[in-house]
Design a protein with these regions (language model features):
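N-terminal glycine-rich phosphate/adenylate-binding segment common to multiple enzyme folds
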Residues: 1-63, 151
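Solvent-exposed alpha-helices and their adjacent loops that cap or buttress functional pockets
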Residues: 2, 22-27, 86-88, 116-118, ...
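Short, ordered loop/turn segments at secondary-structure junctions
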Residues: 13, 98-99, 129, 151
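Glycine-rich phosphate/diphosphate-binding loop of Rossmann-like nucleotide-binding domains
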Residues: 55-127
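Active-site rim loops that border cofactor/substrate pockets in soluble metabolic enzymes
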Residues: 105-146, 150, 154-155
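Glycine/threonine-rich flexible loop motifs
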Residues: 156-160
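Conserved small/polar residues in nucleotide/adenosyl-binding loops
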Residues: 161-167
Length: 169
């Protein structure tokens, strides 16, 4: 309806604030989780108004990925990485998906690979969402812009923003 397809979630460590990661490189965390905001697995909730469960035997949800929205999202990710690169950031886009399991995610990745050809000055890579959950604990400073489906972005952005918050005194 409003075309608000890109949810931009910055994750940044701030100087002189002790965060939850012990590695000294943690002070260099400055990344963006870019989540698609109108499709993905949350599409079912939007379409069906978060219906209560009325069938105790089986329920299905839809992970909707469209070419039109995904192309816009990936282009936005690469343009954001280019803008950040001009300000001294990494200038890298990571496509976070589960393409090895879901056909919808395989399409998401395929479109990413097509769109990256228009941004040859920007480094790009893939990472499965479960591996990314671990990588963001091990070495979050190695990422710049991460683009993903709505639910994955929701989970990772909430989880990893917490890592950069101050610890209790």
């Amino acid at each position: 309806m409003f075309g608000l397809y890109a949810g931009v979630r910055p994750v940044k460590a701030y100087p002189n604030i002790t965060n939850r990661l012990s590695n000294k490189l943690a002070s260099n965390i400055d990344l963006v989780i870019l989540r698609e905001s109108t499709e993905g697995l949350f599409y079912t909730a939007a379409v069906h108004n978060r219906c209560p469960v009325d069938n105790n035997e089986e329920v299905q949800d839809i992970m909707r990925i469209t070419r039109k929205t995904t192309e816009k999202l990936h282009d936005f990710a690469f343009k954001l990485a280019r803008q950040r690169k001009s300000k001294g950031k990494l200038g890298k886009v990571t496509c976070v998906d589960k393409a090895n399991v879901f056909r919808s995610q395989a399409l998401f990745r395929k479109i990413f690979d097509e769109r990256k050809e228009n941004f040859k000055d920007i480094e790009s890579e893939h990472c499965y969402v479960d591996a990314m959950a671990l990588n963001l604990i091990r070495n979050p400073w190695e990422y710049d812009v991460m683009v993903m489906e709505n639910m994955f972005g929701d989970i990772l952005s909430v989880s990893y923003t917490h890592l950069t918050l101050p610890t209790k005194a």
